[in-house]
Structure formats: structure tokens, C-alpha cells
């Protein structure tokens, strides 16, 4: 399983509020190490990796998680609690 976290950077260069909140939750629970890669959707750069992948998966909010399992379509999670319950908890990671 491969997990990608996409976070949004605002025009002033700061992380969006929800992105900060999710980052803090991941850090507090020791889950940040379970994220394989983090991409930044920088509103100042329409070609940033995060914006490009958001377009690819038709996601319009951040943060979001992309969960890739071998032989399956990628799953997109835009709600942290659902991601934690469906991905982290079954994997014995909570």
C-alpha cells in the first residue's frame, strides 16, 4: 500500500488551516511516518505536483489522501476521520 498526502499552500505561502490540522493529527498519533509521499498543491503555481494530481483525480479540496493498493484503483479520501478509520485502523496502525 502506498499513501500520498496532498496539502494546499495558500497565496501567502502558508498551509491551509485544515492542512495544518491534519498534519498536527498525523504527528500527534505518530502516523506521519506512514505517509509515503507528500505533495504540495501551491495555488501560486498551477503546475505544482499537488495541483496536477488533484486535477488528475478531480479533487477540489485539500488536504486529501491517495491510497494505492496493488491491483486496485486508487482510493481518494478528502476526510481525515474516514481515512483514519478505513485505512489506518484496519491496518492496525491506530
Where are these regions (language model features)?
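Glycine-rich loops and low-complexity Gly/Arg-rich segments
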Residues: 27-32, 62-67, 90-92
Amino acid at each position: 500500500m502506498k499513501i500520498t498526502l496532498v496539502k494546499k499552500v495558500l497565496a501567502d505561502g502558508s498551509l491551509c488551516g485544515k492542512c495544518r490540522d491534519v498534519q498536527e493529527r498525523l504527528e500527534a498519533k505518530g502516523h506521519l511516518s506512514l505517509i509515503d509521499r507528500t505533495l504540495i498543491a501551491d495555488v501560486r503555481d498551477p503546475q505544482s505536483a499537488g495541483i496536477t494530481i488533484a486535477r488528475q483525480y478531480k479533487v477540489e479540496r485539500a488536504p486529501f489522501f491517495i491510497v494505492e493498493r496493488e491491483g486496485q484503483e486508487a482510493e481518494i479520501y478528502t476526510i481525515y476521520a474516514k481515512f483514519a478509520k478505513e485505512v489506518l485502523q484496519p491496518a492496525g496502525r491506530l
